[in-house]
Amino acid sequence: RFIPHQGMDESLALIRKRAKKYGLETEVLSASDYSAPADIHGEAWRRVTDTISEVFPGLAYSPYVMTGATDAKNYQAICDNCIRFAPVIYGPEQMRGMHGVNENIETACLPGAVDFYKALIGNNR
């Protein structure tokens, strides 16, 4: 997984160099570069953060570099700015099971997520 400060080509070159040092061969089976970072100064970011503040008052939020493989790359051709945000407050159990066996979200988290999307859609009419 690649990130903005070190893209696919640079990362693969470093991996090949390190592998060569130890007499190892490398083969890339599949690779794609990182998806475009969200514009945290743009209108989309402001709408999402305003809605977070409205639905989850007092909740802190912050942009960060997401190294996970998200669907954002699939939307780049039709969307200039893809905000990656899940309106769910995960508990310790959900964090431990993320992408694992029996991954789940507590039903208690769902009303907040529904409220968030209702407000986001309502605020953007």
Where is each model-derived feature located?
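Metal-dependent amide/peptide-bond hydrolase catalytic core
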Residues: 1-118, 122-125
